[in-house]
Amino acid sequence: MDFHQTVADMAGIERSQAKTINLGLFYGMGKAKLQAELGLNTKEEAEKLFEKYHSRVPFVKDLMNNTSKDSQRNGYITTLLGRRCRFDTWEEAAYRPGKLTSPMTWDEASSKFGENNIRRAFTYKALNKLIQGSAADMTKKAMLDLYEEKIIPHIQIHDELDISIESKKHANKIIDIMQNAVSLHVPNKVDYESGENWGDIYD
């Protein structure tokens, strides 16, 4: 399944637009950034695109808001395999255009703004950290399972592993190990390419 195309179909927009919004929202992308990324003429166009997206794909905004609230309340998010990503710095709760301050410790922030006027910093990135952290969990678990079978990757590149294979049967074994490294409610698909060397298949 192509997630970006699925969202594009739901929102009634182009796949490239859906992909930009899907990925950008996880980093807190706003109207100005969306306008620049898609080459739109005005911020109003970007705002209308956001409105169309969120009205037809409401679960994304709900997920973002809920994850942000959880991290604000608890001070951390927990990845798929239980690792905690903490939000230990603080900032003024009220947004003041042109008067941004650097994140501080709780003592510094409460002393400067008052303890009732501060919030945890960077919680808008909570969903991104949850997704990236959980993806890292899955990759690391797959690498451990491969190691148990004496299969050692040459290199890890983000969520990709470069491994020498002996045969198609060997490749299928690697794929099976990686796809079953973490048990999920939805199938975990592993894409596979092979060639005489990395340069032949890496683009």
Q: What spans do the regions from the language model cover?
A:
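Conserved catalytic core of nucleotide polymerization and phosphodiester-bond processing enzymes
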Residues: M1-D203
